Amino acid sequence: MCLILFAVNPNSRYRLIVAANRDELYARPTQIAGFWESLPDLLAGRDENMGGTWLGVNKKGAFAAVTNFMETPPDPLPPRSRGDLPIGFLTSDSDPNAYLDRVSARGNAYKGFNLIVSNRDKCSYYGNRAGAPRELEKGYYGLSNQILDCDWPKVFDGRAKLMEIISAFDDPGEALFSLLLEQGDDRKFSSSFIAADTYGTRATSVVLIGTDGNLLFEERNFGVNGIPLASNRFQFNCDVGF
């Protein structure tokens, strides 16, 4: 059960704030976040099974992330990988709305997913189980493996805590990581962080994109039973270039 908590234009300092957990089988081969040799403008982790990603940015300050949509029973496996969807946006200069319109035209070629894409001007959302693409207004949002802003406790409570953190901290990074590590209570879908022996939270990520062009991407990785592993931190100004 992945989690993405994010704020669109929350204040004069930031145009996008993201706190995200990727939950996956520990046995699934994964590369930790970094710039890709084959796509040098792309900064993201990589799923080695299918070659895609779950969350990333590019050097121009665009952002994209995807989650699976939980379905019972699961749909038969279509030919396209959902992890290609963030890459398609981050390796283009597409307008977010235009990109999601193109994706929605072939949405039935994928298993259920939610996709967030953002550039300097706008942030937009599309889920192929959630209706038409839409541009997101200024505000605070939560996404897991259901529709945007569903009533799951970790989404509902997480969004409220995201608002509190952004109001309280000029630099919210560490507070966001603490939020992502919360293990919830007895309610179903309440745990942000999952620590188990075969499946759990593999990566926690914080992305801060400032109105001044400064971009921070930090990823912390975890193994079986939530044991901390590697961490990576990247910071650059997407207005200056490389």
Predicted segments with their positions:
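N-terminal nucleophile
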Residues: M1-F242
